[in-house]
Each structure stands twice: as C-alpha cells, then as structure tokens.
C-alpha cells in the first residue's frame, strides 16, 4: 500500500520508518485517520497551489514549509518534495510565521 501511495501521489517521507515515526507522533492530531490518510494529507498540502489559505515560505536551499489556514496543518518539505514533517502546531499560524522568519544556516 505504501508503495502504491508513493507512486500515485509523488514523494512521501524519505523512508517507511520516518513515516511510521511521524504518524505515531502526530497522527492523533488529525483525529482517527490511518497512516495512509496522514501521508495523503501531507502530500495534498505540499501539492496545493500557494495563495489564499495556503501560506508558503521558501529557503535559499529549496526547502519549504506550508501552512493551511483552513485546517491549521503545517508541513515542511525538502527540495525534492519529500516530507520532513507534518502536524498541527499548537500556535497555528504564529508557529508558521516564526519558522519562516528563522535565519537560514
């Protein structure tokens, strides 16, 4: 199933282990969803066009983060589109803005 999701929807996490770890840590924040649903939501945020309710911040190295104002979802992504993390921050948009303003190393 994971392989099918990966092929059908583009990159996921860098490894199955990373997906498992992030789902275990953050999956409950999204209610009663499966690991596949968690992955799909992270991919949908990554693939949504920025603008309107979808905020985006890009770093010089190509990494980027997104925040969905409608649902409070935050995602951070590598340059190649693989998912770094996906969760619902306690401080919502403030968290996104704070991350976006952090200096690039």
Predicted regions and their residues:
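Short, glycine/alanine-rich hydrophobic alpha-helices that insert into or span membranes
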Residues: 1-7
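Aromatic side chains
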Residues: 13, 22-23, 38, 67, ...
């Amino acid at each position: 199933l994971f392989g099918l999701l990966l092929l059908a929807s583009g990159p996921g996490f860098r490894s199955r282990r990373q997906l498992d770890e992030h789902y275990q840590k953050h999956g409950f924040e999204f209610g009663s969803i499966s690991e596949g649903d968690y992955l799909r939501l992270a991919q949908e945020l990554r693939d949504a066009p920025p603008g309107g309710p979808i905020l985006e911040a890009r770093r010089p190295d190509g990494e980027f983060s997104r925040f969905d104002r409608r649902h409070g979802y935050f995602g951070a992504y590598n340059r190649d589109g693989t998912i770094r993390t996906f969760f619902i921050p306690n401080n919502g948009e403030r968290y996104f803005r704070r991350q976006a303003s952090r200096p690039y190393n």
